[in-house]
Amino acid sequence: MPQYRSRTSTHGRNMAGARALWRATGMKEDDFQKPIIAIANSFTQFVPGHVHLKDLGQLVAREIERAGGVAKEFNTIAVDDGIAMGHSGMLYSLPSRDLIADAVEYMVSAHCADALVCISNCDKITPGMLMAALRLNIPVVFVSGGPMEAGKVNWQGNMHKLDLVDAMVAAADSNVSDAESEAIERSACPTCGSCSGMFTANSMNCLTEALGLSLPGNGSTLATHAARKELFLKAGRLIVEITKRYYEQDDESVLPRSIANFKAFENAMSLDVAMGGSTNTVLHLLAAAHEAEVDFTMADIDRISRGVPCICKVAPATAKYHMEDVHRAGGVMAILSELSRAGLIHRDTPTVHSPTLGEALDKWDIMTTNDEDVKKFYRAAPGGISTTIAFSQSMLWPDLDTDRKEGCIRDKDHAYSQDGGLAVLYGNIALDGCIVKTAGVDDSILKFTGRARIFESQDDAVAAILADKIEAGDIVIIRYEGPRGGPGMQEMLYPTSYLKSKGLGKACALLTDGRFSGGTSGLSIGHASPEAAEGGAIGLVEENDIIEIDIPNRTIHLAVKDEVLAHRRAAMEARGKDAWKPVNRQRHISVALRAYAAMSTSAAKGAVRDVSQIEK
């Protein structure tokens, strides 16, 4: 029988000093016999996805106490990728994931907490906390802040839905008036919550459902809706229940590594492919699997992407549907149920809330359930009022979206495409693979051949696009932006948004060893591995080289003879200490970022740390 970790600091005469300090935090005598549950909150006023989380940790804490536990809350940092986008701030986004994981590990381990509730929401916070939870392997429940309502603007009597990307594209489009651009800007992000499309934050919160570590509805229930409050209350009760099952009944099935096993990672990736999730999820799932000691690799992602159809299409892949529409159609449980009917997921994986995922689907699938509470839960609708307050409205859709032929979520026979929403491409320019969000690629450019335009920083590429130096048929190459070369593996939302604003969204491609925002659409290929800074062939591409992209056949090819590439590689190596470094790039790299670069690995491995690179 495992011993409560907390008793290291709460039991025994030699721990009198520690108990004195615990008492100073408000603990009473009988509290020393209870499990201590850490609450990792990520409230910050910098991020709309987190601005409403301030009191939610204490909401969970009171529920933990009522269930018989002791709750202790702490905070992590949270970077807003949208605000950090397009300048040097983006260098810090991906590194913050590891910092968050470490912070959670430090707090939980230093204070010997028995279990953990993770209150996350946005891009790097959910992955960072997920990595920490799998590293610690103590009972955990995830509950996120929830999606933002979609923006809405009335143009000439017609209502249009908006999101953050619309504001970026409109601002760079010379055909959009200042008044129109300002109207879009003011309407694009109307409430608290993670950005309203299937961007990275919402993708990751959906994946925690598929992994079995969060409650049904976690990925899709709006931040503003009263129905989301119950998820926080349930999380408080549930964490005490599973904590006691582990420590008092020796039930290891509730531990995160027992739940997030290889099959669960396959389920999560199948969901990701089916809903056309952010390409960043590939990076984060690989990193999470590494922490869980699960042998889940790019080869598995490639295999799954070839066999799972795209049955849900959401912004930025379409302007018609946002997360509020996914919820109305049954949320993550509905997507997984359609995959289950197609025999494409494992129903026998455990979850924190149900013995198996299959049993959870039987209850929460709106197409088959007789539970009226479940049906009402998925009718939770946007309130249409600008607010930063959680649970502030209780609007309901008049009905559910159960149209599996032409609705937001479809069955396999009526899929948006029988090919999945994400794909791994291989070729001489990316021997270890690269990633494209096929759900956002127009059918007309699934096969594309173009000439390379070389940029060794995102800033230079943006300047060229805005100066109309990029033409139809060009493939914009942005290199030395990988985990080590950036460092920090910047997102490329501005270049792709500006290509769209210039009318080149279906006429150009972009290839980078950096990554893309979940808000990116178009023929945008990221994570090229090995990256240029590690000697990857993307560092050998020259201006006007021809590159052939074939998504249906999962290939990307630099049309340069092997002997020419070998000559270029030799010339690069001859540069000595300047080899595999950008030419004439002016960029300040802080000590913190240099430390990150020294330990980081390839995107093909999730950009996880490998301390052996600096150990002597």
Curated annotation (Swiss-Prot):
One of its GO terms (biological process) is isoleucine biosynthetic process. InterPro entries: Dihydro-acid_dehy_C (IPR042096), DihydroxyA_deHydtase (IPR004404), DiOHA_6PGluconate_deHydtase_CS (IPR020558), ILV_EDD_C (IPR056740), ILV_EDD_N (IPR000581), IlvD/EDD_N (IPR037237). Gene3D superfamilies: IlvD/EDD C-terminal domain-like (3.50.30.80). This is Dihydroxy-acid dehydratase. The gene is ilvD. GO terms for molecular function: 2 iron, 2 sulfur cluster binding; dihydroxy-acid dehydratase activity; magnesium ion binding. Functions in the biosynthesis of branched-chain amino acids. Catalyzes the dehydration of (2R,3R)-2,3-dihydroxy-3-methylpentanoate (2,3-dihydroxy-3-methylvalerate) into 2-oxo-3-methylpentanoate (2-oxo-3-methylvalerate) and of (2R)-2,3-dihydroxy-3-methylbutanoate (2,3-dihydroxyisovalerate) into 2-oxo-3-methylbutanoate (2-oxoisovalerate), the penultimate precursor to L-isoleucine and L-valine, respectively. It comes from Methylobacillus flagellatus (strain ATCC 51484 / DSM 6875 / VKM B-1610 / KT). One of its GO terms (cellular component) is cytosol.
